[in-house]
Amino acid sequence: MDDASKVPWATILRDPRFRAIFFFGLASGLPSSLVFATLSIWLREEGLSRTSIGLIGAAATPYAINFLWAPFVDRLRLGPLTGRLGQRRSWIMACQLMLAPAVIVMGLQSPQTSLLTFGFCALLVSFLSATQDVAIDAYRVEILKPEEYGVGAALAIYGWHTGAFLTGA
């Protein structure tokens, strides 16, 4: 058993780094569960065919291929935002600022009457969320010591599941 696993949870939760990791995990779980689970249930209730649901489900593809643009997230500076927040948090903030309206616009679409627009919104939410995940994972590795990675990963996953639960998945 390493030293980090012996630290009481109360001590861990007082550390602002670990609280940030939990809340970033929560922010990650909210949109991803929308794209993976809640979306297909909603489309089924709207009476869409299984083929249409399957095609819209392909919008989750960015989660599987986000490693392709991870180097850009790692190196591309976001102007003054990077200067104020740093490389990782600027990407997280930028993704959050774009995710909120994308989720709202997706929610305002009727899949029955504007399936293409709805599908594009789902793809955009997925892309932004997958990009945010890249930045969140990099941030976690950057702010923690190697012996804290396990606790950090546990809190991130707990946060993710909390976010997924909150969106009804």
Name each region found by the language model.
Residues 50-51, 141, 146-155:
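Loop-to-transmembrane helix entry/capping segments in MFS-fold secondary transporters
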Residues 39, 130-144:
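Intracellular juxtamembrane helix-capping segments at the cytosolic ends
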Residues 3-63:
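Helix-loop boundary and gating motifs at the non-cytosolic
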Residues 78-79, 90-113:
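C-terminal ends and interior cores of transmembrane alpha-helices
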Residues 53-79:
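Central cavity-lining transmembrane alpha-helices of secondary-active solute carriers
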Residues 63-67, 150-169:
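Glycine-rich segments within core transmembrane alpha-helices of 12-TM secondary carriers
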Residues 32, 64, 124-136:
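Core transmembrane helices of Major Facilitator Superfamily
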